[in-house]
Amino acid sequence: MIFSTLEHILTHISFSVVSIVITIHLITLLVDEIVGLSDSSEKGMIATFFCITGLLVTRWIYLGHFPLSDLYESLIFLSWSFSIIHIVPYFKKHKNHLSALTAPSAIFTQGFATSGLLTEMHQSEILVPALQSQWLMMHVSMMVLGYAALLCGSLLSVALLVITFRQDIRILCKNNHFLNKSFSFDEIQYMNKGNNVLQNTSFLSVRNYYRAQFIQQLDHWSYRVISLGFLFLTIGILSGAVWANEAWGSYWNWDPKETWAFITWTIFAIYLHTRTNKNLQVANSAIVASMGFLIIWICYFGVNLLGIGLHSYGSFTFSSNL
């Protein structure tokens, strides 16, 4: 009873704190001068990290096994992973744009985990024989950490594509506007218009420079985070293969979860290849990463809804896991 009450308290505290953090982020987006608020949001995510850590440890002690045996626990661990990705650059004093993604991602996953849909899974249950293994912690934790990093990196790539697309549309519209005006006036008016265009161009060049710098930063952090997530995903798949051989007598069975995990791994392997290829534009790799965002959710959550395969321990009751 004590552990259950403590878990309930930590769950609501972490959810409330991360909600406040998102509010602070929205305020700092509107008012850049308030430096103290930005620092408060970072400290809020640190508090969220410790609350979720306490929640996981409490559930670990209460249940007697590592809390990654069902969808509820894996979502809490996913929220914990988002908070880690958020605070690590903060301690390293690196400025990045992950904070705009990790805080909403954390509140989304934790909000869904604590919703009424998964209420039955909050109670303790005896592990099925297939999950009673020392590989549970290694395999599932690596997979969830990989999902978290890949989701963050993919969202950065989506943001990169949106900014690049808007920039291309704006440049195209300005060029068409300039051409139309150029051929509709006489020569003197054209020269005056040309001088104005040069002045506007100097202003736009500065703005385009900062936009290009921002796009470069998005690409840089997307590549770093996806590379880390790809490493975690690879370790998770390999450890899962070893576990599968011990449990089922085969390293690979091509059930839905394994198939989509392989598809996810392939998509991000293609991303890393296109990203390191200097002959290809940045947008090409960003498109691949954006596709990977949808693939991850299919692999992590969508396949569980099918209720089939070796990785399904319960059908549409949300009692399945990775």
From Swiss-Prot:
Pfam families: Cytochrom_C_asm. The chain crosses the membrane at residues 17-37, 44-64, 71-91, 98-118, 143-163, 225-245, 258-273, 286-306. Its main location: plastid. Keywords: Chloroplast, Cytochrome c-type biogenesis, Membrane, Plastid, Thylakoid, Transmembrane, Transmembrane helix. It is a multi-pass membrane protein. One of its GO terms (molecular function) is heme binding. The keyword Magnesium does not apply. It comes from the Eukaryota. Belongs to the CcmF/CycK/Ccl1/NrfE/CcsA family. HAMAP family: CytC_CcsA (MF_01391). NCBIfam families: cytochr_II_ccsB. This is Cytochrome c biogenesis protein CcsA.
